[in-house]
């Protein structure tokens, strides 16, 4: 009888050990990112699957800045802002699938210039028909046609950008973060202004400009935040 009791105790210990040590069958397995190939259960996927549908852009929380430069003058940069007017972002199970951002071109503003002067003069010039002709074309718009998730919060956004009534494709990387019932989309695009008939100071179309040649490409950085 004593031997049987010892045997029974050993059986119980073995059974308990089996259930404690074995890995649950429903625990998701992924390969770690450090290149060792070790299996790591329950790795986060950075997706909020409850975030779904079309979300409106909050213009008061969204921002956009631009950077221009002169081609032949080292470190000559002009900086400024333009307001985000409206837009939306479309999500399916926490994944960005589409949307659009509308910019208020009448709000375009130069905050600093390469010569540290004449910001108001540059602002007026940008609004004139020599540049963006905001009286005739008060809005610019980017419409997402493809949102390819590249891992984590990083996407490659492709879409149609309309400036001065002309539309052309553009692609750029963006970070999309969903948290606390809202989303932010932050991207940086390099844009060739001459495609949109903004030719002033471009050596593609004008000669004898000297060091007043303005780079055809400018940088637009924006952050669109949903309501």
Regions found by a protein language model. Give the residues of each.
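Low-complexity, acidic/polar, glycine-enriched regions of mature
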Residues: 2-227
């Amino acid at each position: 009888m004593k031997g049987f009791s010892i045997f029974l105790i050993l059986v119980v210990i073995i059974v308990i050990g089996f259930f404690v040590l074995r890995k649950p069958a429903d625990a998701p397995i992924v390969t770690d990112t450090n290149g060792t190939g070790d299996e790591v259960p329950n790795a986060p996927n950075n997706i909020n699957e409850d975030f779904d549908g079309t979300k409106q852009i909050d213009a008061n929380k969204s921002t956009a800045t631009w950077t221009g430069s002169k081609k032949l003058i080292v470190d000559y940069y002009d900086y400024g802002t333009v307001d985000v007017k409206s837009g939306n972002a479309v999500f399916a199970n926490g994944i960005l699938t589409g949307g659009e951002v509308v910019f208020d071109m009448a709000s375009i503003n130069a905050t600093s210039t390469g010569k540290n002067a004449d910001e108001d003069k540059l602002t007026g010039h940008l609004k004139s028909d020599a540049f963006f002709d905001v009286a005739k074309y008060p809005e610019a718009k980017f419409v997402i046609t493809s949102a390819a998730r590249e891992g984590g919060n990083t996407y490659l956004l492709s879409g149609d950008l309309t400036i001065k009534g002309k539309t052309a494709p553009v692609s750029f990387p963006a970070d999309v973060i969903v948290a606390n019932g809202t989303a932010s989309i932050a991207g940086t695009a390099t844009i060739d202004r001459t495609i949109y008939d903004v030719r002033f100071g471009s050596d593609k179309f004008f000669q004898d400009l000297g060091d007043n040649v303005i780079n055809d490409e400018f940088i637009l950085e924006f952050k669109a935040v949903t309501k």
